[in-house]
Amino acid sequence: MMLRGNLKQVRIEKNPARLRALESAVGESEPAAAAAMALALAGEPAPPAPAPPEDHPDEEMGFTIDIKSFLKPGEKTYTQRCRLFVGNLPTDITEEDFKRLFERYGEPSEVFINRDRGFGFIRLESRTLAEIAKAELDGTILKSRPLRIRFATHGAALTVKNLSPVVSNELLEQAFSQFGPVEKAVVVVDDRGRATGKGFVEFAAKPPARKALERCGDGAFLLTTTPRPVIVEPMEQFDDEDGLPEKLMQKTQQYHKEREQPPRFAQPGTFEFEYASRWKALDEMEKQQREQVDRNIREAKEKLEAEMEAARHEHQLMLMRQDLMRRQEELRRLEELRNQELQKRKQIQLRHEEEHRRREEEMIRHREQEELRRQQEGFKPNYMENREQEMRMGDMGPRGAINMGDAFSPAPAGNQGPPPMMGMNMNNRATIPGPPMGPGPAMGPEGAANMGTPMMPDNGAVHNDRFPQGPPSQMGSPMGSRTGSETPQAPMSGVGPVSGGPGGFGRGSQGGNFEGPNKRRRY
């Protein structure tokens, strides 16, 4: 039964010779090997198979294979590794004939023919298909000329040396992808799987490979943290698969001369043995010198790595010091900015305080001026009344100065003498009654004890806390609560009722006990 899709129908031809050739060329998995053998068997023209009857179109003529089965997991298609060189082509071959020669191995992507020199190139889909086509078509007679098929030289491959042990295939491919598309990147390892420090990179075209070679040669391309640059060189191409078969040897005179004797061991003491020994000694010397050179190079590399580690440590310390100095400089600059900001704030605060103090002083000065103005307006008439009161108190009796300082006391007579200081009679401070000791009226023993302090409200009126307003009392009334040691004096002649405000001593009878508001309380 025929399968559809990416499948092709092939003819089956059992040829033991081609079967052995295919088994030696293809060492892949069992399904791939079986499919490869089936493709190889279809190389030579086979006897025409009987055509199936027309009434049975589904009868099988062979078996079908899937081209995708020849792709390895992750393998890219149509790479440089799938490119074949075909030599010894007829000069009259056409491109259609050349394609028809490889049509059984998939659709090619590149076909080039140089008819003058008799060679061409073709690129197949996978490496496995290219190996099958090479194994099948190499040596095939085409127009009486045997074809010579080899894998084409990879002109976009580079050798990478001085790799770090931590570099992998993926890292190598990622590093060189910046120059162009990479088809394959491999780090070479030994039989134990340890990295040898070498690898190769295959680009899809020559321009990216040339660019990578120039850039890495002019500069230092680092793959890891270690400052260890990679060394990039063009890859040396070797054919280690086919080698040099006998059929390709040129039969020259030197060839026939060297082939006169078969392979053998030289016998000791002979001419052959002597020079063979000298050749071996030269090879041994070359080996020793190479080992010495390798040893010197290895020691130099170790020394360089040690110096590099020390220099890296010193460099890190220098970077840390520079970073510390930079941070200190930044902190100092921030501190300066902070100090400047604080200074500005302090100046602003001082200006505010100065302005506030100036405003307070202005308010205090304004308040003082206002108080002074009020005093000048309110105390001027009261001062005249106090003067009149003091002048009137000069003609009063011994107890006349009791109510001095009262703003509502009657003013003294105009014919009296000068008033005593602050309205007090300094000559009447004795507790024993007697004649007055000097000019001026006599003052009672308690005259100065009951002096009030005039109080002036905002309206200019004078009030006395100790002499509240009340009914008028008599000026010379005797005080019944006085002690017996005091002898009340007679009221002064010629002194009538005292005129004044309602808060002065009362008018009227002088007899009886004095019950005025200035009477001392007894506790």
Swiss-Prot record:
Residues 283-377 form a coiled coil. Residues 82-154, 156-237 form the RRM domain. GO terms for biological process: activation of innate immune response; innate immune response; membraneless organelle assembly; negative regulation of DNA-templated transcription; regulation of circadian rhythm; regulation of DNA-templated transcription; rhythmic process. InterPro entries: NOPS, Nucleotide-bd_a/b_plait_sf, PSP1_RRM1, PSP1_RRM2, RBD_domain_sf, RRM_dom. Expressed in pancreas, kidney, skeletal muscle, liver, lung, placenta, brain and heart. GO terms for cellular component: cytoplasm; fibrillar center; nuclear matrix; nuclear speck; nucleoplasm; nucleus; paraspeckles. Pfam families: NOPS, RRM_1. Changing residue 275 to A: Abolishes interaction with NONO and localization in nuclear paraspeckles. The modification Phosphoserine is found at residues 409, 473, 477, 509. Residues 497-514 have a biased composition (Gly residues). Residues 231-358 are annotated as: Sufficient for perinucleolar caps localization and interaction with NONO. It is found in: Nucleus speckle; Nucleus, Nucleolus; Nucleus matrix; Cytoplasm. GO terms for molecular function: RNA binding. Residues 472-490 have a biased composition (Polar residues). The keyword Nucleus applies. The keyword Cell membrane does not apply. Keywords: Acetylation, Activator, Biological rhythms, Coiled coil, Cytoplasm, Immunity, Innate immunity, Methylation, Nucleus, Phosphoprotein, Repeat, Repressor, RNA-binding, Transcription, Transcription regulation. Residues 460-523 are annotated as: Disordered. RNA-binding protein required for the formation of nuclear paraspeckles. Binds to poly(A), poly(G) and poly(U) RNA homopolymers. Regulates, cooperatively with NONO and SFPQ, androgen receptor-mediated gene transcription activity in Sertoli cell line. Regulates the circadian clock by repressing the transcriptional activator activity of the CLOCK-BMAL1 heterodimer. Forms heterodimers with NONO; this involves formation of a coiled coil domain by helices from both proteins. Found in a RNP complex with CAT2 transcribed nuclear RNA (CTN-RNA). Interaction with NONO is required for its targeting to paraspeckles and perinucleolar caps. Interacts with SFPQ. Part of the HDP-RNP complex composed of at least HEXIM1, PRKDC, XRCC5, XRCC6, paraspeckle proteins (SFPQ, NONO, PSPC1, RBM14, and MATR3) and NEAT1 RNA. Interacts with ALKBH5 (when acetylated); interaction with acetylated ALKBH5 facilitates recognition of N(6)-methyladenosine (m6A) RNAs. This is Paraspeckle component 1. The lineage of its organism: Eukaryota, Metazoa, Chordata, Craniata, Vertebrata.
